Every structure is written in structure tokens, then in C-alpha cells.
Amino acid sequence: MAIRKYRPTTPGRRGSSVADFAEITRSTPEKSLLAPLPKKGGRNAHGRITTRHQGGGHKRQYRIIDFKRVDKDGVPAKVAHIEYDPNRTARIALLHFLDGEKRYIVAPKDLKQGDIVESGPGADIKPGNNLPLRNIPVGTTIHNVELRPGGGAKLARSAGVGIQLLGREGAYATLRMPSGEIRRVDVRCRASIGEIGNADQSNINWGKAGRMRWKGKRPTVRGVAMNPVDHPHGGGEGKTSGGRHPVNPQGKPEGRTRRKGQPSDRLIVRRRYATRKRG
């Protein structure tokens, strides 16, 4: 993937850039692997906003991705196309299996049209192949890693990310996450070889608010810029600091929201960025 920069012909074009989509080989998706994706606008079943800054955007259809691949062990597949997926940052690859079935997978780096991929304990160590962690050499970069055997890939599914297999001891493998966290995972869990492609996606400059609206992202308005009826930080004469510790529109303290004491915390060897100096 490369990034194409625009000339500053308008204020919205100034500094903006776009992916060149050179790796895309087909523009129309496989119809049998599509599912409807109705818009929620960030609302729940009662019509209340539960996730802010969502709404609008271009109409999409969901591409059904195979995150397990366990039922295709030993069945080789040919990469028919590399396609664009509006629902994720990574590209997806359409596989044609030898038994005639078609499936989508997340496309790793260096996977090309015409390549052969396979899954199972005996698969080769090359991009796109899927194996249990116990069969992958130490030091290999992997993606689409399961947290529980048979549960489907949960880790490293975004563009440009990869996990390093640091070692194995007993029933667990030690992994280094993209965040720097080191955690243990059952060696029966499966993973795909290589890092995910489209790494330059994070370097795209969207240029104008309208492009974010096309993506279904609405503006983020500060609470101190609102009226008192809209936010606890709103109101006041002139510019104010809000007058209290940061809270959300419902008055609950803002900040870290992750629940402590999760059962899987015992498998974390080192928290993310534990060695980074603060200052």
C-alpha cells in the first residue's frame, strides 16, 4: 500500500491524502459472503444514545470473515482476490478452497493473488497459513490470535499489527502484543502467520470533516462548550473550566473504564508500556 497526497487546490484538499488501493484486485464483493448491516446511529433498543459520535455515513454491507478456519484443516485454498472492506482497516482476501467453498480472511502483508494458503498443524510457516500456537516456531510474527481454543480470533485483527511469539512453557505460549503487553495464551489456540497488511492506513490524513462523516463519525463537542441542559460541564459566563472533575454527559466520572480483576488478568505477565518512563 502507498499513500497518494493531494495538491492544495481547496482548503479541504490541503494536506489530505488517500490510499492508492494498488493491492485491490476486485471492486465488487462476493455476494454469498455478504450480510445486511443496518445503521444504529449509536442508539440502543430504546432509542437512547449509548455510543456518541456515531451516525450517518455511506451505506455498507458486512463481509462475513472466517476467524476460526478450523473446519478447513488440510484443505488448500487459492487467493482469488484482495478486496476492500469498509468495515475494517485491513484488506480482506477471498479464498477459493479445493472443495469449492469460498471464504474471506483478513489479508496479511505480502499475501498476493494466486497464492496458496492452508490451515492445520502441518501447514507451512508462510503468510496467511493458520496453525495452533504449539506448531509455530518461537520468534514468528503472527496475527488473528485466539484467546480460548476454538473461540475464534480476537487479537491483532487491525491493519499493520502483529504479535510476536516469545516462547512456550508447558500449556501456555508467551506473546508480545502490539501495545507492549506480554501475556500467556493456551498453546491450543490458533493464529495466522505474518502481520496484517495495509500498515500505512494510520498515516492517512483525512483532510476535512466531511470525509469523517462519510465514514459515519460525527463531531466530538466538548462539554464546556455546551449549555447546562446538555452537559454537567456546560454553562457559565464566558469561558469556564467546567468547575468539576471530568464527567460524561450522564455525570459519571470520565477516564479509565476497564473493569479490574478480570479472570484473564492472571495470564498477563507484564502490563502494556510498564517500562516506559513518564515525564
Swiss-Prot record:
Stored Pfam families: Ribosomal_L2, Ribosomal_L2_C
Protein name: Large ribosomal subunit protein uL2
Subunit structure: Part of the 50S ribosomal subunit. Forms a bridge to the 30S subunit in the 70S ribosome.
Job description of the protein: One of the primary rRNA binding proteins. Required for association of the 30S and 50S subunits to form the 70S ribosome, for tRNA binding and peptide bond formation. It has been suggested to have peptidyltransferase activity; this is somewhat controversial. Makes several contacts with the 16S rRNA in the 70S ribosome.
Matches recorded under Gene3D superfamilies: 2.30.30.30, Nucleic acid-binding proteins, Ribosomal protein L2, domain 3
Ranges where the record places region Disordered: 33-58, 223-279
InterPro entries the UniProt entry points to: NA-bd_OB-fold, Rib_uL2_dom2, Ribosomal_uL2, Ribosomal_uL2_bac/org-type, Ribosomal_uL2_C, Ribosomal_uL2_CS, Ribosomal_uL2_dom3, Ribosomal_uL2_RNA-bd_dom
Record flagged with keyword RNA-binding: yes
Entry's family note: Belongs to the universal ribosomal protein uL2 family.
Comp. bias regions, Basic residues: 40-58, 269-279
Key words, A-Z: Ribonucleoprotein, Ribosomal protein, RNA-binding, rRNA-binding
Cellular component GO terms held in the UniProt record: large ribosomal subunit
Any one GO molecular function term: structural constituent of ribosome
GO BP annotations listed: cytoplasmic translation
Organism for this UniProt entry: Salinispora arenicola (strain CNS-205)
Coiled-coil zones: none
